[in-house]
Amino acid sequence: QRQMCIRDRNQSAHGDREFGHIVTRMRKNRKVVVGHWQDEKAQGQIATWMRVCAGWADAQDMLIIRFGDQMNNVAVTDGDKVSAEQVLGYHVDYCPVNDLMKYYNAVEDKNVQAMVDTYFKEYDHAPELEKTGTEAYTKVWNSAKAEIALRRILKDTGAKAFTTNFNDLGDFDQIPGLASQRLMEEGYGFGAEGDWKTAALYRTTWFMSQGMPKGCSFLEDYTLHFDGEQSAILQAHMLEVCPLIAEAKPKLEVHRLSIGIDSETARLVFTSKQGEGVAATIVDLGNRFRLIVNKVECIKSKPLPKLPVASALWIPMPNLEVGAAAWILAGGTHHTSFSYDLTVEYWEDYAEMAGIEMVVIDENTTISEFKKELRMNEVYYMLNKALC
């Protein structure tokens, strides 16, 4: 009798095989977890899938607001917005910067003062930054005003993500970088230079990693650091890096930003934690979307006194030469959504749910094999349409 009970509880000769056959016959992508329900490994795989389900569900009504247009002469940050809504759930709306300026002009001084006080309370800063009447204080004040305006318009529209563009700032006196940093920390997706796909992907990254300890951020391949086996990529942007990845308390500073309107600009300055993570991006290849994921290791950066921005320094797996070459061959963006907590498995599940291509660059990647994979994928995704 006992043997029969054990067999009944664990037998799958008919149930999962039959169901698996039916779903395979229907050409349905899905995750298969094999293991006892009390095993930690099986529970972990299911937990990963559940987090991805939550992120996927959140994306299905995701509104991304583009304040201004794309950065000029940049193709990779744009894409087919109709296909993006059909495949990924993203709805992308354009909002003239002047509409945001109307919100900005309507912000009350008392609310700005409260926000400025919050800045000085939460972040390290030079004492002279609190001196009213100075240009630096005015920049902090205007940054607070811009943050309040952004919060209000995002709430009114129901947007979960947004983009800005330093080429399209209207009457603003500085790019709203400080506001973008703080809004990312609270879960709003952000993409610079009109990059709505990365803005949406960051929102999903943040959503899937809720309750995890290490953090995530929008990042950009800023500059290459060639140093033998320690060759790495400096990850930064003009300003917009999320404080969730900061190693220590961020410092509020005001410095000149010569990109865009060339003005003194408030920002949070910090360096990232050390440790392993994954960087992800989605690109539009014309006939499909491709998710590119690279395992990376964030290392300690030397002081960068002439680059007062938030930053991370990472070595892409398996090393800079192979990792960067593979990323370029795959058509990857210079923007990514980065997480210390998520693993490749999360993005595999996400790609399965979305029904999109995924390529992984990790410690086992070689250029010759990676090229073969890209070529085979090209054929597969053309033929796969005929099977659906």
Question: Which residues does each predicted region cover?
Answer:
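Anion-binding alpha/beta catalytic cores of soluble intermediary-metabolism enzymes, centered on
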Residues: R9-G44, D171-D227
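Long, internal scaffold/assembly segments composed of regular secondary structure
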Residues: V116-G211
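Cap/lid and interdomain-hinge subdomains that line or gate substrate/regulatory clefts
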Residues: R7-L129
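C-terminal catalytic subdomain
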Residues: G187-V309
